[in-house]
Amino acid sequence: MVEKVPMTQNGFVKLQEELRWRQQEERPRIIEAISEARAHGDLSENAEYHAAKEAQSHNEGRIGELEDLTARAEVIDLTKMSGSKIKFGAKVKLIDEDTEEEKSYQIVGDQEADVKAGRISISSPIARALIGKEVGDSIEVNAPGGAKAYEILSISWG
């Protein structure tokens, strides 16, 4: 059975845009670079040719990965999400119980995660600790710098 990959509509659109760019713009550009480098003669010591072939390999690998991800995508409609328990798509405001620092995160798919932008992967330790919890609950997360305790201040959707 094919394992579905949960993601938001935004995340799915970004993957589709990258796939289109790699197939329709980057692939032809690389093919042209290979053709130009090939015209320079001896391929055994042609750095431009080898660089272009390496770029082609990387691009084709990423195209395969993107095709797989978009085929297995399970797009979650965040506008239909609600409830008092944290699940995929939730926007959560936490307070560090030691430093009193507030943090806000949205739980998203692995491909969409960007901690600096406040989006954490559903498979991250903090998201796994948050799933199923409610406002007022406390969680403990084992972080690289040691265990951190947070209290959940709010949950929102969309």
From Swiss-Prot:
InterPro entries found in the cross-reference section: GreA/GreB_C_sf (IPR036953), TF_GreA/GreB_CS (IPR018151), Tscrpt_elong_fac_GreA (IPR006359), Tscrpt_elong_fac_GreA/B (IPR028624), Tscrpt_elong_fac_GreA/B_C (IPR001437), Tscrpt_elong_fac_GreA/B_fam (IPR023459), Tscrpt_elong_fac_GreA/B_N (IPR022691), Tscrpt_elong_fac_GreA/B_N_sf (IPR036805)
Care to name a GO molecular-function term for this sequence?
A: RNA polymerase binding
Q: Which UniProt keywords apply?
A: DNA-binding, Transcription, Transcription regulation
UniProt entry tagged with the keyword Transcription regulation: yes
A Pfam family the protein falls into: GreA_GreB
Task: Give GO terms for biological process.
Answer: DNA-templated transcription elongation; regulation of DNA-templated transcription elongation
Q: Which family does it belong to?
A: Belongs to the GreA/GreB family.
Per its UniProt record, what NCBIfam families does this chain match? greA (TIGR01462), PRK00226.1-2 (NF001261), PRK00226.1-4 (NF001263), PRK00226.1-5 (NF001264)
The protein's role, per its UniProt record: Necessary for efficient RNA polymerase transcription elongation past template-encoded arresting sites. The arresting sites in DNA have the property of trapping a certain fraction of elongating RNA polymerases that pass through, resulting in locked ternary complexes. Cleavage of the nascent transcript by cleavage factors such as GreA or GreB allows the resumption of elongation from the new 3'terminus. GreA releases sequences of 2 to 3 nucleotides.
Instruction: Report the HAMAP family cross-referenced here.
Output: GreA_GreB (MF_00105)
Q: What is this protein called?
A: Transcription elongation factor GreA
* Source organism: Rhizobium rhizogenes (strain K84 / ATCC BAA-868)
Lineage of the source organism? Bacteria, Pseudomonadati, Pseudomonadota, Alphaproteobacteria, Hyphomicrobiales
Q: Which gene encodes it?
A: greA
